[in-house]
Amino acid sequence: AEFVTWAGELNILVNNAGILFSGPFEQTEISAHHKTMSINVNGVLNGCHAALPYLKQANFARIINLSSASAIYGQADLVSYSASKFAVRGITEGLDTEWQKYGIRVLDVMPLFVQTAMVQDMQAKSIQNMGVHLTAEDVAHHVFQRAVAKDTALTATHQAVGAKAKLLFQLSKISPQFLNRLTNLYLSK
């Protein structure tokens, strides 16, 4: 409400809050798993819920959620983070369909690992094996593109960010589940 009073309108919301704990599931405190789910999922729910009345009034309205390539297939050593990003993916899909009647598109971006403080010193093998090549600016560029793009029936709800994430996302659509599992087992060793 304060922002709308200042700016006059809210027509784009970017949900970007998130935390990550890495390590074997059983060695991570249950409170860390709960905190990850709470912040990463409830932050998106809260942002969407609070913004809806204002977005409904806008001529052009869009929500961009920061999901993750970890929502393509569950990741060892990042279990609660991956689960939270699957939830963001589900929220994005559900609201994109539900809020079409208001003219609101709900989209996401799904980057692989990004060069931020969040992934420094992380122990997950998939981070070590895949590397951290994206910058915050790379992701911001994709968020901006999603925010201002003309809406067409061909505008995909999800956009993988980075060559590796795009490849994994496309392969996950066409490859058998056992192959997805074997690929992730390989990446997590």
Predicted regions, residues:
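Conserved amphipathic alpha-helix within the SDR
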Residues: A1-G8
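Conserved NAD(P)H cofactor-binding loop of Rossmann-fold oxidoreductase domains
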Residues: A17-F21
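Substrate-binding pocket helix/loop in short-chain dehydrogenase/reductase
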Residues: P24-F25, E29-H34
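Active-site helix of classical SDR
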Residues: C48, S84
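Residue(s) in the substrate-gating loop at a strand-loop-helix junction
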Residues: S68
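Active-site-adjacent segment of SDR/Rossmann-fold oxidoreductases
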Residues: Y73, G94-R105
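C-terminal helical subdomain
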Residues: D108, Q128-K166
